[in-house]
Every structure is written in C-alpha cells, then in structure tokens.
C-alpha cells in the first residue's frame, strides 16, 4: 500500500478549485508519503519506508511494476511542480521531471501516465501534454 498526505494543515480553503490551484505555489503544500506492506503473520500493516520531504498535492500516484517505481506529482519551493519516481523498495528518488512554477505542472487530481515508449502523458490542470523523455 502507498499513502500520501495531501491535506494542507494550516490553510482553510473552502473552494476546491481555488485549493487545487493555490496549494503549492501560494499556500504551503502538505508533504509526506509512506509505503506499507501487509504482515501476514501479524495480520497488520508494517511501514516499509517514509519520505517526509516529498510533496504529492493532488494527483493520483501511479505504481509501475516494470520500473519498480511509484510516481507522484507535487510542488517544490525551489523548482516548482514536478513528477518524482520513487523506488518502491527504498523510497529513494530515481526519476524526476521538473515543470517549473507555472500551473501547467499541476496535475489537479488526474492520473500520472507513462506511454509505452517511456514518454510522459501529463494530464495537467491546463490540459494534457506529452513530455518526451
């Protein structure tokens, strides 16, 4: 299992559209992702790894079994919007695409998709576009 913290703690945003556009660039983005594994002997979830520094503001994470990565879309104060590929076993960043500080890199509750040739089909708040990798 993989979970993200995408609830802004200090900001009360009553309008979903305003929230999805402002959390990150204007309002402080929430951070934190964690991978769990089911322990069949204890019948309970066990944490495999956590990353308190990773932002996943609204886009649905995607797991790639072929690359052994989980992909998240978030906002970084220095670089702006990005997609990070985290190693499924360790949580280490293995892949990163930086979009910059405009909202074109805001996935706004969409799904991260990689094409068969490895290019990213990014479903942005401003519409889908292809990122050649």
What is each of the regions a protein language model found here?
Residues 1-98, 102:
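Loop/turn-rich, solvent-exposed surfaces of beta-rich toroidal or solenoidal domains
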Residues 104-133:
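Blade-level signature of beta-propeller repeat domains, shared across WD40, Kelch, NHL, RCC1
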């Amino acid at each position: 299992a993989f979970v993200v913290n995408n609830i802004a703690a200090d900001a009360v945003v009553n309008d979903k559209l305003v929230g999805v556009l402002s959390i990150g660039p204007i309002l402080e983005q929430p951070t934190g992702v964690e991978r769990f594994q089911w322990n069949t002997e204890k019948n309970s979830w066990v944490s495999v790894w956590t990353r308190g520094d990773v932002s996943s503001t609204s886009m649905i994470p995607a797991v790639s079994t072929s690359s052994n990565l989980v992909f998240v879309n978030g906002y970084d104060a220095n670089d702006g919007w990005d997609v990070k590929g985290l190693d499924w076993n360790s949580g280490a960043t293995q892949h990163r695409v930086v979009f910059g500080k405009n909202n074109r890199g805001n996935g706004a509750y969409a799904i991260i998709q990689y094409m068969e040739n490895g290019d990213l089909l990014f479903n942005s708040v401003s519409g889908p576009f292809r990122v050649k990798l």
